[in-house]
């Protein structure tokens, strides 16, 4: 296994790769859907044990997928998980747990809902972690509305008259910043006095 380039004078060797891929869709029935996949691999052979066979370099330690379908209000209509590769056979016992999220709304308090509905020992850490980028992908998927061709990225929100969910969510979208003042002046506040 080749060494990676030096960083600040230290040589390094790749030991683990986690890949996360999320894709968002608009379905014919009007629901928005996200598919998310998490794959963990190692660049070296892992010995067999009584739970699984030997893993060759690049074989997945985890290969976990989830799918969520929501409506325009972000209410969850469908939620499912599949696990093609796990370190232990008991891991797949948690696949049905995402169904507990059906009927819930994604928005403020979502992380607490996930903790309450899925918990720690009834769920899978990696599956719960995958919900984060999956939900972010849903927001990005829905941001242009259902007829996005030719629109700029904010046109749908600007035309709705409603305060977009992302205002106040980061430095660029702070209410006292120049971007909100320019794009959504009705939601802008005066900049705070600086010392």
Q: Model-found features: residue ranges?
A:
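Short, Gly/Pro- and small/polar-rich lid/capping loops
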Residues: 1-45
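Active-site- and interface-proximal helix/loop "cap" or "latch" segments in soluble metabolic
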Residues: 24-26, 40-195
């Amino acid at each position: 296994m080749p060494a990676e380039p030096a960083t600040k004078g230290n040589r390094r060797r790749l030991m683990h790769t986690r890949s996360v891929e999320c894709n968002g869709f608009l379905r014919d029935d009007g629901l928005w859907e996200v598919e998310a996949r998490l794959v963990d691999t190692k660049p070296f052979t892992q010995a067999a044990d009584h739970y699984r066979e030997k893993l060759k370099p690049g074989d997945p330690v985890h290969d976990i997928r989830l799918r969520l379908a929501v409506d325009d209000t972000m209410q969850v209509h469908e939620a499912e998980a599949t696990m093609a590769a796990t370190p232990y056979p008991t891991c797949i016992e948690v696949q049905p747990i995402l169904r507990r999220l059906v009927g819930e709304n994604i928005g403020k308090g979502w992380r607490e809902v996930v903790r309450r509905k899925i918990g720690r020992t009834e769920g899978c850490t990696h599956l719960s972690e995958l919900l984060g980028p999956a939900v972010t992908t849903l927001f990005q998927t829905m941001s242009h509305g259902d007829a996005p061709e030719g629109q700029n990225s904010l046109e749908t929100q600007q035309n709705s008259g409603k305060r977009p969910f992302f205002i106040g969510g980061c430095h660029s979208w702070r209410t006292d910043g120049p971007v909100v003042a320019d794009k959504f002046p009705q939601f802008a506040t005066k900049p705070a006095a600086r010392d």
